[in-house]
Amino acid sequence: MEEFRVPDKIAPEIGWRVWLVVAHTPDRLALHSAVQAKVEWPMRQALRAECRRLVAHESAGVVAVGGPAHAAPDELCGHGGGHGCGIYATKSAEDCADYLKGFYSPTQVRGAAVVHRILGKVALWGRVIEAERGWRAEYGYPAEIWIPPTLHVASGREIGTTRAPTLPLGRIADLLGGYGVPVRLLAGDAEPLAA
């Protein structure tokens, strides 16, 4: 039986994060973690964090080997140079964009095409660990999805290149509407930073 814990607060933290948009079929897009690309964010249900110590930074092709997994997030996980488990979000769109600029972007996840990378707001709850620029949480779900026309990405060895989505933006917005949260099409890359 799992031990009952009284939550620290009732309202979720609202942060910013980046997702990959993956086309599993022509009519089904899903959000995936930009760092743990194989982690799909399910529609209409919360994502629960797991300690993935053995597959840290899989989208960049780096595998970190560690001890046994534990409940996530954990205060001690990540100390001494580890990955620090949990669902990540930054406190501001600016910090999220800074985090994104030099990050590798895969073109496929498990054989499905990555059609875009997007920013958005995410609700975090359960056990939440605060850091200087954001949080790591036990549970998360998109609160708003922001679709820019392009995102500056690192692809292969080229850092700072611009990639256009491989599907029309309106189609991406329609298919991501299944998450049941506001989906915003943006006119320019900087627009999410003004909100």
Regions found by a protein language model. Name each.
Residues V114-H116, Y139:
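A short, structural micro-pattern
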Residues M1-H83, K101-V114, G126-V128, P149-G156:
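ADP-ribose/NAD+-binding catalytic cleft of ART/PARP-like enzymes
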Residues T90-K91, G120-W125:
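Short His-Asn-centered micro-motif
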Residues G134-A195:
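Active-site-proximal loop/hinge segments that shape catalytic or ion-binding/gating pockets
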Residues A93-P106, P168-L175:
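A short, charged, amphipathic alpha-helix used as a generic interaction element across diverse proteins
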Residues H83-K91:
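A short, exposed loop/beta-hairpin motif centered on an aromatic-Gly-Thr core
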Residues G120, E130-W135:
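Conserved inter-motif catalytic segment of the P-loop NTP-binding fold
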Residues E40, A89, G111, T162-P165, ...:
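Intrinsic-disorder-associated interaction segments
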